[in-house]
Structure formats: structure tokens, C-alpha cells
Amino acid sequence: MSDQKKEEEEEAAAAMATEGGKTSEPENNNKKPKTSGSQDSHPSPLALLAATCSKIGTPGENQATGQQQIIIDPSQGLVQLQNQPQQLELVTTQLAGNAWQLVASTPPASKENNVSQPASSSSSSSSSNNGSSSPTKTKSGNPSTPNQFQVIQVQNPSGSVQYQVIPQLQTVEGQQIQINPTSSSSLQDLQGQIQLISAGNNQAILTAANRTASGNILAQNLANQTVPVQIRPGVSIPLQLQTLPGTQAQVVTTLPINIGGVTLALPVINNVTAGGGTGQVGQPTTTTDSGTSNGNQLVSTPTTSTAPASTMPESPSSSTTCTTTASTTLTSSDTLVSSADTGQYASTSASSSERTIEEPQTPAATESEAQSSSQLQSNGIQNAQDQSNSLQQVQIVGQPILQQIQIQQPQQQIIQAIPPQSFQLQSGQTIQTIQQQPLQNVQLQAVNPTQVLIRAPTLTPSGQISWQTVQVQNIQSLSNLQVQNAGLSQQLTITPVSSSGGTTLAQIAPVAVAGAPITLNTAQLASVPNLQTVSVANLGAAGVQVQGVPVTITSVAGQQQGQDGVKVQQATIAPVTVAVGGIANATIGAVSPDQLTQVHLQQGQQTSDAEVQPGKRLRRVACSCPNCREGEGRGSSEPGKKKQHVCHIEGCGKVYGKTSHLRAHLRWHTGERPFICNWMFCGKRFTRSDELQRHRRTHTGEKRFECPECSKRFMRSDHLSKHVKTHQNKKGGGTALAIVTSGELDSSVTEVLGSPRIVTVAAISQDSNPATPNVSTNMEEF
């Protein structure tokens, strides 16, 4: 039995030696393994120990010395490092969206057994003296090895290049895990915090901090949204707080202004400089966070580089409270981070030595403490409180600080002078506040052109009332309000003046009007007894609208219709007098444009047929006009005598045998055109109905006048008459004179038409060939 046991032990030792030789074969390639067949002696204890150690082996020889795991949660703004700590540097680049721009710089790995660890992808940035950066990207290593980062290059709209690093993790089973930056549901339990540490040379190192640490952390705001951080060489970090929870709408403060008995609400923006005294209001260039208690908000941007950190004291007896929140201006070497939910400020100086300033702020204060807010707090920052909202709204930028003034009720502003105050920070920086004086001169300017309604109604011919508007150009001060006329209608005031003859004259100051009508209503003229003369300045292209007063003005370019059917038309032949409604007669003398136009109002008799309503057919009625007289053509003793209707316009004196012809003639004087062409896209207006019928035939192409000799048809009767005379001249021979007018040759139309006409005189001479007479034509105006 003993010999058999010894043989078994020898075989086991030989087998172990064989395995040990195979294991050490990669280390010693020149050596051959030993077998137990060549040895008869017993193995020594040292050989057994070496075989046992070689059998066990080292499990981590062929693997990397360490594996780096980085957990990134961009939606929460967190980075957590596991296993070996690794430095992460923020590259000089511009942020895009909610992604963190991270670059991993791995330390050199140790080399054992001729196995080199592949380096991870890295990206670096070299900063020059002028602050410009030139990012470079290097990538090496086997893609299947762990501890690798995926670098994504993003092109910005501004032209710069961004690099986004996404780590690829490997599980125990060897599966690759790639983190999705948009989803954070699986990483909610691994919430870490970020700490900014100054490393000198305008660089900031982003490392993982303890979860229980409370200083120098960049926390979330009240809305649980990401806080974008951007690091630039030589420039401070701008921190912008996100929108606060709640649906407060931003309302611009309106300032009530009384203009002519009408209260207007003009949107204004108040701008108070740091030095006090005078301020100029304009459109702000920076935005502010909404969320005030009432929505009334005044935005003020200081013009100095350092804004005073002060607080407007509240007045319990006043209905208006102004609260100002200000801070210091960050220099190029200061870094400021804010935590809105904890109310803490942390300032880190970017120098070789790390300096941390923590300034906790009291979240709430009583009303008595707000009244005595001139005293400094222990932390060096004063409280800015509101009676209805204790939440402080701060926006910190790397430029002049934006001040925010909250007004509870826009009734009266009470601004008190603040004595000079100073406070000292822990880092040794001293800020001196500037004494503010009460506002003395405030210049207001409307943000947008404001339409101001002035109670000056104008009645249109259709019966509608239109309101004239005046645009406020500038407002210098509340006591001195200047309103510039925008070329709209002006109101004229008539003042009675006693003349040498004992009559009362109503004079109107000359007013230069460009393209706008002047309105004269009955109320202005009725207050003046025995009104006879009204002087109106040069009108240019404007007209005069008369309410209840019959006035017709000549030497006025264009046409204008009054409220009582009175028309204004340019007339260059003679002065015109019109009687409408039996109120008065108006005589207007045609003068040069630089002179005044005299309007003479005379008492007259009522005329029933002076007004003509468009669209109605006129019927023949007995004329009761006092200007009409009995006819003298057949003698006064004849029973069948005719009345003659005389035009009462001064300087005209035309006589007509029919009242319809006189009415048509008066419409020509007043400029009325009641007959409108209803053809598609035409709409021309005419004074007489026969003119409308003649015009309508131009659309239809109707030729109703036919020559009895040659059956040639014409559109107008005067063309037919001219054609008939050519036949008569051919038959008669010799020299004949043909006079053809531009209107129709019937007697009724000739009597109605009182305007000048162009007359064609054709002299026809007979030559040797009677078939081809010579015709010489000349044009004369009568």
C-alpha cells in the first residue's frame, strides 16, 4: 500500500509540473517543459509550491489595470465618477442645448507583460494670450476595449465647432453600454453634484463632489431645469436663472395722461441712472424674468460700470413701493454661481489659490425690518422684500447689473434718498454705493407710436360719424406736453370782431392745412350774431366741410362734399353763389392761392329744389324760384307765355326754359355727379343723365343713329349731323361752312350745358375736281 501511494504522489507531482511548464511557456519561450517521466526521484516541496502558485495564476494580468466609469446625466446637470477618480476639464467651447461639453484626460496606464493599455479618445484646447482657442481632437485605441469615449463633433450656426464626449461602459458580461444624453430615467438614483475648482491659467476643473457638501455647488433652480454654464478664458461665467414656476404675465406700466379731457394710458419704461437726477427712458436691451406680484414692472439699466447694491425702503403710508435688487459687476477673474432654491451665492476667484465666498441670504423679513433696511446685514447683502411676495428674483450677467423695480399700485412713486453705504466682502473687495437723489426731471418717450382719440367727429355723406386721430410724436414732460400735428383735420374757432361799419365779423386765424378738410359746424357760427364774413387761409389741396352752412369755395384743387349735399369744385370763370336750405347765400371770390378767400354770408330765401338726391328720378314740378321771371319772347299780354329760369349764381346769369335744365346746370356749378355708370370696373359719375347714356353706349357698342342716305350708323347724334352735312356740301358745291360742336345739337342739351365747349370750324373750298374738296380745319374755344 505504501508503494502504491508513493507512485500516485509522483504521478500527481509530474502532472502539476507539466501544467506549470505550460503556464510559464509564454514567459520563457526558449525553455522546454519538464515531464515526470524523466525523473525517478521525489519532487521537492519547493517544486510543489511553485507548481501550486503557477496553477493559481494572476487573474488580472491580461486585463487593463483599471476601468474608468463615468455617469453623465445632462437633464439633471450631474456627473458622477466611479472607481478611479479622473480629471475632467471644461473645454473652451460654446454650449448647445442641455449637453455638457466634457473632455476626459486619462493618466498613462502601467505596462505589464508587454500588454499596453489603449488610450481613450481625448480632446484638448490650447488657449493663447488673446483668449482664442484652437480645439484639437485625437483618437486612438481599439474600439472594442473598455474605458473609451465617443467624441461627437457639432457645428454651431455661428461657425464654431463643439465636441461632445459620450462614454461607453462595459458590464461584467462584456456588453457595451452607451449612455443616451436625452434619457435620465435609469440614472435617477445616481445623482451627483458638480464642483468648480480654480486651476489657474483661466481653466476650471469639473470634479465630483460629496453629496453632502453644501458649498460651491451648482444646484438646480425652482423649476428643476438645467443651469447652463459656459467658461471662457479671461471672461467671467454668466449665470442665467430659468423661469420661475407660475403664470405671471408681464405687464408694462402705463402712465395716465390727460389730453383735452381724455385720459390716456401710455406705456412707458422708466430708466433711473445710478447717480440720480435725470434719466432718459428708452427700450431696454436686456430681458428680465417675469413674475412680479402685480405684473407692473419698471426695468432700469444703470449706465455706470458698477451698480450700487441698495434697497428702496418701504413706506407703509404710501400706496407704491419700489424695490431694487442690484449686485456688483463681475470682473474677468471672478466666477459667480447661484442656487435659487437655497438662496445662496458663491463666488470663486479664478486664481492660483482657491477662495470661496459664501453669502447666505435671509429668505424672508418682516415689514418693520424692511423699513429699517438701511442697516447692513452681516453677510454684506441687503434684503429686497415685497409685501405680497418674499421670493427674490435675480438675474446676474457679466456686464452692468440689471435692476428690477417692482411697483404694487401704479398711482404714485415715492423714491427716497439713500445715504452712502459700504460693505466689505470676505475676499477684501469693497463696494461704495452712490447716493441717489429724488427724481426731478423725467423725460418720457412712448415705446410705440400711440394713437390718441380726440373728440372731433366728422359726419360723412352716408351718415356715419368718423373720429379724427392725432399721433403723439414726443412728450417732453408731464407739465409741458407737445403734440405735433400729423396733417389731420384742425378745428377752427370763430371770434366776433367789431368793424367800423357796425357789423360783426367772424375772423378765423389763417391756418396752413395740407390735404385735410376744415370743418365749420353750425354751433360755431350760431354763437356769433350777424355773421357776414369768414376769412379762411390758403387751403391748398384741402376742402371745406360745412355743417348746416351753405358755403361753396372756388380756387380749390379737387372736389369735396359737404354735410348738406353742398359740393366744392374748382371754378376759374367767375365767383359762385349757392343757396342751400334757405340758411344763407355764400359768395366766394376767386383769388390767388397766397391770398385769403372771402366768404360772404347773406340772408336768403329757402329754395325747395336746390338739393338733389342721387339715384332718384326727377319729376317736373312748378317752379317757385323768385329768380325766375316771366318770358318776354312772345309779349306780356299773351296767355301762353313761358317762364324763364335764370341761374342765380353771380356772374353766370344763364336762362333756361325748364326747371330740370336749371337743376342740371346748378349741379354743374356745385360739382354734384349723381349719375353713376354701373358697368363692371367702371364707376364713372356724370352730372346729367344724357351724359351717362352716351357713356354707356361706349361699353355696349350700340350705334343708334343711322344716316338716311348711305345707311351708315353712328354712336352719337352730333357725329351723324356732321356726316349728313358732308352729303349736303357735295350736292350744293361751292364753299360752305360747317360748325360742329362737341355736344349733342338738340336744344335741350345746348341749354343745359353751360360749360365752355370746343367748336370745330371747317372751311370747305371747291376746286377743279368737285368730288374731292379741300377741307381746312381750325379749332377755336368759345
UniProtKB/Swiss-Prot annotation:
Residues 107-119, 344-354 have a biased composition (Polar residues). One of its GO terms (cellular component) is nucleus. The keyword DNA-binding applies. Disulfide bonds: none annotated. It comes from the Eukaryota. The keyword Thylakoid does not apply. GO terms for biological process: regulation of heart contraction. The 9aaTAD motif is a transactivation domain present in a large number of yeast and animal transcription factors. In SP4, the motif is inactive. Binds to GT and GC boxes promoters elements. Probable transcriptional activator. Required for normal male reproductive behavior. This is Transcription factor Sp4. It comes from Mus musculus.
